[in-house]
Amino acid sequence: MSIAICGGGIAGLSTAFYLARLIPKCTIDLYEKGPRLGGWLQSVKIPCADSPTGTVLFEQGPRTLRPAGVAGLANLDLISKLGIEDKLLRISSNSPSAKNRYIYYPDRLNEIPSSILGSIKSIMQPALRPMPLAMMLEPFRKSKRDSTDESVGSFMRRRFGKNVTDRVMSAMINGIYAGDLNDLSMHSSMFGFLAKIEKKYGNITLGLIRALLAREILSPAEKALKAALLAEPKTAELSNSMKSTSMFAFKEGIETITLSIADELKKMPNVKIHLNKPAKTLVPHKTQSLVDVNGQAYEYVVFANSSRNLENLISCPKMETPTSSVYVVNVYYKDPNVLPIRGFGLLIPSCTPNNPNHVLGIVFDSEQNNPENGSKVTVMMGGSAYTKNTSLIPTNPEEAVNNALKALQHTLKISSKPTLTNATLQQNCIPQYRVGHQDNLNSLKSWIEKNMGGRILLTGSWYNGVSIGDCIMNGHSTARKLASLMNSSS
């Protein structure tokens, strides 16, 4: 038995890890087009004489994970099986990083409430002032008669009005997807469950309460996966220990998780990793029960790469999934008191005026992981603005750093000269699920079933969720499905 996995990011690595454990007699070849594994999980340590540790740890992509939900359980299951619990950095639910979050609109910081008292105070802020009336009116708004997909922006405006959508939801979409909420698919976004609640109950405010009481938030597949994960003693134990944890990071950076998976895979005799070796051919084998990848026959192929790459290999229906690019600028100050406020960071909605450098958000990294005992932030710029007008992309890292420092001055009044900076353009890093994404995905899967005998399985951020947790969860589910298929055919 043999399986090929195309793509060495977190989704491909997770799939390989679970497959190798579930089917130890199966040969697994993992193909990665680049020189390293891990995809967008990129932690770098840069030498710095002014840091007590001699280096500064920067994250060039995502940096934290959450323990909550089914995806959170999948994160914890992988961590427990890798045995890297001691490398975690837990962030308490009571910490400033968990409680204090901000939206910058129109020219000031608006604190997002984390308590009832905070909610009372927050309604006087310009970004959140429309919320109370919108929440009161929401149950009385007409629901959508059909179940067709629509944009996140369209859905939210129907249910909560223009101001809440433009000032609050736009900020969230910028932070999660670096995208335009007017283009993003409601059904395929992380808010898709709200559309299901509207369809069943007619509104969100009361419907959400009823759905929570009836435990209807999770799909049957999610409930089954949750039960399977909690049946693992170490996973359940780790989950219980995370009750007061809002999120967690890794002491040596988020790349700890992908490096740990790679180390485990290298120890497994049934796994071979092929770096700098992309899938150049993907065709049905002459026996029609196998698939050829680069001339090698496999019983199944897990495609954990972009739909664009898949479309270049086989004559399948096109997903037409665009992407967002983000300039990530890391900034370190040896002074630990540079930040004027404490918290996780701030997000900027697209309707905020005077945002010429298209800043999406600023993360206060030193609140979460600060071995350097200084002040550390990450400024993220671009997203849909870069997609719509590529001339807005800074032509070099120096320009990006200058833009980021201007944004820090404008939003947080930070004028201090940084000790160390690092700028990285992450091109095409976040897939943008357009309206109709799920229908397109179903069409692609049907084509694979008909023309490739169902021998190709899709996983990763291009198909079923862009977060690390989504990728790990879907990698786990893909491995379980493959194990079931191969066991039933043997």
UniProtKB/Swiss-Prot annotation:
One GO cellular component term: cytosol
Gene3D superfamilies membership: FAD/NAD(P)-binding domain
Biological processes annotated in GO: protoporphyrinogen IX biosynthetic process
Binding positions for FAD per the UniProt entry: 7-12, 32-33, 40, 61-64, 466-468
SUPFAM superfamilies named in the record: FAD-linked reductases, C-terminal domain, FAD/NAD(P)-binding domain
Keywords carried by this UniProt record: FAD, Flavoprotein, Heme biosynthesis, Mitochondrion, Oxidoreductase, Porphyrin biosynthesis
Cofactor note: Binds 1 FAD per subunit.
Major location (coarse): mitochondrion
Subcellular location: Mitochondrion
Annotated catalysed reactions: protoporphyrinogen IX + 3 O2 = protoporphyrin IX + 3 H2O2
Pathway participation: Porphyrin-containing compound metabolism; protoporphyrin-IX biosynthesis; protoporphyrin-IX from protoporphyrinogen-IX: step 1/1
GO molecular function ontology, one term from the record: oxygen-dependent protoporphyrinogen oxidase activity
InterPro entries: Amino_oxidase, FAD/NAD-bd_sf, Protoporphyrinogen_oxidase, Zeta_carotene_desat/Oxidored
Cofactor(s) the protein requires to work: FAD
Membership in a protein family: Belongs to the protoporphyrinogen/coproporphyrinogen oxidase family. Protoporphyrinogen oxidase subfamily.
Protein name according to UniProt: Protoporphyrinogen oxidase
Gene that encodes it: hem14
